Amino acid sequence: MAKEIKFSEETRRALEAGVNKLADTVKVTLGPKGRNVILDKKFGSPLITNDGVTIAKEIELEDRFENMGAQLVKEVATKTNDVAGDGTTTATVLAQAIIREGLKNVTAGANPILLRKGIQKAVTVAVEELKNQSRIVETQEAISQVASISAGDEEVGKLIAEAMEIVGKDGVITVEESQTMNTELDAVEGMQFDRGFVSAYMVTDVDKMEAVLNDPYILITDKKISNIQELLPVLEQIVQQGKKLLIIAEDVEGEALSTLVVNKLRGTFDVVAVKAPGFGDRRKEMLQDIAILTGAQVISEELGYDLKEADLSMLGRASSVKVTKESTTIVDGSGDKKAIEDRVTQIKHQVEQTTSDFDREKLMERLAKLAGGVAVVKVGAATEVELKERKLRIEDALNATRAAVEEGIVAGGGTAFVSVIPAIGTLIESLEGEVKLGAQIVKKALEEPLRQIAINAGLEGAVIVQNVVNSEAETGFDALNEKYVNMIEAGIVDPTKVSRSALQNAASIASTFLTTEAAVADLPEKEDAGMPGMGGGMPGMM
């Protein structure tokens, strides 16, 4: 296929146009007075959201070169979402600012490679300074503040803080849709492990790519299943009962897998197979944990059990199981409470006895899964459109809270970025030439999140930024109440991990963007011309 090639300034301008189209769409959502964006959907009602990464993922531009620019910034939002789960709009705003300031310098003749070096040096200093300012999150109130700021809703903040209190920081919190108009918290004992379905054909919800089994039987074995004959006796009993089945095995492959998939697609029975978590002896222990939680018996030749002889009494039960590509969550297993308590006590004893940090960490993980359980935040709303919007906000708040517990918090509302500017100023004094220009680009870009929050609140961004720069440490602008306050004391905080990831990812993509000198894109295919037109009418008769 023929290609179209653009060079130097023409390339950069086309790419920047794409960056701006995406970033300008996303950045209207930043801050407490940020607006929402409505996204058209092929099926169902449109989605209204303020989630940066959800908006970015929807944007595809017609111009191929502009689209390349947009996709680069989309990568910033996606990567930040993957690492921290929140801060995607902030990351997009920072990337746009670094690209804008950087292109001014490149156009003026600066060397982009040296600019990139300066950007990287400044980001390293900024990240270090953010970590120095970070405060550990310990109280339920601090957790509530982080969640409230992210979701823009105090009630949600309290719910998430309560959920963290119930399951502990190592527990599992999921977000589901409620059948009522209220948003409430439901804590259920459960377990999550990092193994997903062995075949994508087993999903029950194609949009979310997940399989949900309500009230299933659970078969647990430490052997590889490749022959369907081994499973037939127990499968026949399950089909007669009309129940669903979760298989946890070393692997399910070959004839066994294809037969299960075909029968699932035909609707004969509902089955999901997942690989057993862990390796070696740890796998045996984890399978035993799951068995105790669900009231099952691990079918293992070591214990004298054969898969062919398995019956329903050896299978576990749970109220529901959710399996995604990467994880399996078992909720409300029907195991004996006393047996679960004994197992928890046994693991605690092992934690005390072990001298290996790695073993201790793995034992604590198992303990959290057995004792911590699963908290479910059930999101309610009057309409489906509002429900989806609220659900996205709560998922963001949950991610922000986890990030805060992990790495601590800094002053929110863009204040933390402004507060690291003096440290970059010190760095700039030690640099020279175009490397110095690169550091200055970051220094200016760090003002952008605060400026955008002020603009979205209908205020003059430059004035607000200047006032905060000249204020004491941790003093920032409360855009909701339009006043200057100590952000930490006012509970306006951001997770350090979110701020750090946003800056690192924005700088990574933006600095690489500046080094671009040529772009290659497919030429649009030309439509085949139709048959040439025939002359109308009959030839004249003599």
Curated annotation (Swiss-Prot):
This is Chaperonin GroEL. PANTHER family: 60 KDA HEAT SHOCK PROTEIN, MITOCHONDRIAL. InterPro entries: Chaperonin_Cpn60_CS (IPR018370), Cpn60/GroEL (IPR001844), Cpn60/GroEL/TCP-1 (IPR002423), GroEL-like_apical_dom_sf (IPR027409), GROEL-like_equatorial_sf (IPR027413), TCP-1-like_intermed_sf (IPR027410). Its main location: cytoplasm. CDD domains: GroEL. Keywords: ATP-binding, Chaperone, Cytoplasm, Isomerase, Nucleotide-binding. One of its GO terms (biological process) is protein refolding. One of its GO terms (molecular function) is unfolded protein binding. It is found in: Cytoplasm. SUPFAM superfamilies: GroEL apical domain-like, GroEL equatorial domain-like, GroEL-intermediate domain like. Its EC number is 5.6.1.7. Forms a cylinder of 14 subunits composed of two heptameric rings stacked back-to-back. Interacts with the co-chaperonin GroES. GO terms for cellular component: cytoplasm. Belongs to the chaperonin (HSP60) family. ATP binds at T29, L30, G31, P32, D86, G87, T88, T89, T90, G413, D478, A479, L480, D494. It comes from Clostridioides difficile (strain 630). It is an enzyme of class 5 (isomerase). Pfam families: Cpn60_TCP1. It catalyses: ATP + H2O + a folded polypeptide = ADP + phosphate + an unfolded polypeptide. Together with its co-chaperonin GroES, plays an essential role in assisting protein folding. The GroEL-GroES system forms a nano-cage that allows encapsulation of the non-native substrate proteins and provides a physical environment optimized to promote and accelerate protein folding. The keyword Isomerase applies.
